[in-house]
Every structure is written in structure tokens, then in C-alpha cells.
Amino acid sequence: QHDPLKLTEKDDRLYGLGSTDMKGFFAVIYAALEPLLRQELKFKQPLIILATADEESSMNGARTLAKLGKPKARYAVIGEPTGLKPINMHKSIMMETIRIQGQSGHSSNPALGKNALEAMHEVISALLNFTQQLQADYQNPHFAVDIPTMNLGVIHGGDNPNRICGHCELEFDVRLLPGMANDSIRESISKLVKPIASKYQTKISLTSLFPGVEAFENQ
């Protein structure tokens, strides 16, 4: 209904990409500080407003600042929309790619090729079953979504109905609960797809779109 890249006001609400997330926080903090700045008050300690890039995915901005050890602060307010409820944990985020390389050929004789789409069909079934098992084994009632999740977000494969699909790619994200490790899940997925590669005589590779962020809990 609204252009996400343009702030729109309607019925006392503001609509736009990030308006209730990080961009909303910047508007709030600026509004809160403006009266103090008008009074030309001298702060006893510096007050820093920090914005980081790639907050929704790779966290590259925050990673760089953490690596540099800057800035130093005694206290911090994180501008996430939590309804003023203290939050001491977050899920992990992984974004992964599975690539299947088969062998193309003419559809008149499918046996002459190695169909990457058929192999991917079995990979997807294995991933869904794996996710169901994770959700049965792990729950945390402190999260609104109290289970680990996997979203199959992007798939590309084939270029013509009369050709055997020689290449297929799947991109997905995984969000784990505290106590679960990203690398452990990657290893489990890698073991899942190996027998599928052998069955369909294809090559299957698993790579990360970015390093990922581990789940966190602060006692």
C-alpha cells in the first residue's frame, strides 16, 4: 500500500522501511536529545549515537566496530523495538547456499542427464525433515517464535522445459536458539546432502552467504 523507500504519514502512523525498527529509533533519540541541546547543557561524558551498516544481515558495521574496539562506553541503549522490555538473548542468523551441479541434456531421454532439480527436490525434503526434528528437540519459551526456524527463500534452476536441468541453487536462512551452534548445523546439513549427491550422481556444495551471527544469551 505504501512505497517502502518513502516515509508516508497516514492516520497518525508513519509507514516506511524500518520505521518501527532502527530508523524509528533514530527519530526517537533525536527528538529526545533536541531539548537538551537547545539548553546547551554540558554532558559530563560523551553521548554517542551509533549507526551500523548491514544490521539485517552480515552485521559488517558492528563487526568492524567490535574489531576496532570502538567506541568505548559504560552503558548502551539498543534501539530495537522491544516495547521497553529488557531483552538478554537473541537467535542466531545463518544464510546459506546449496548448489547442485548435474548434467544437462535433451528432455527426450532424461536418463542421459543428471537432473539437478530432482536432486534438489530431495535436498529440500531432507531440510524440511531436519528442521522438524530440530523444532522437536529445541524450544525456548522466552522467544515469541520459540523454536529454531529455517526459511527456504530463493531457488533457481533450469532454463527450458525441454532441457534436463544441469544446475540448481537454493538459498535459505536458519535462526537458532541460544545453546545451538551455527557450525554444528552446517555440518549436519552437509552430512544430509552427501548421500543425495551420490544417489543422483551430482556434485553438491554448501556455502555461506556471509559468516553468520551466533545465538546469544546474557545471564
Show where each model-derived region lies.
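Conserved beta-strand positions that form and line the central face of beta-propeller blades
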Residues: 6, 13, 154
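Soluble metallo-hydrolase cores and metallopeptidase-like ectodomains found primarily
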Residues: 1-8
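Short active-site-adjacent structural elements
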Residues: 1, 86, 217
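Structural signature of FAD isoalloxazine-binding scaffolds in flavoprotein oxidoreductases
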Residues: 1, 78, 167
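Fold-level recognition of mixed alpha/beta catalytic cores in primary-metabolism enzymes, strongest
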Residues: 10-14, 19-129, 146
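Metal-dependent amide/peptide-bond hydrolase catalytic core
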Residues: 95-219
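Conserved hydrophobic/aromatic pocket- or pore-lining residues that grip, position, or stack substrates
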Residues: 7, 49, 172
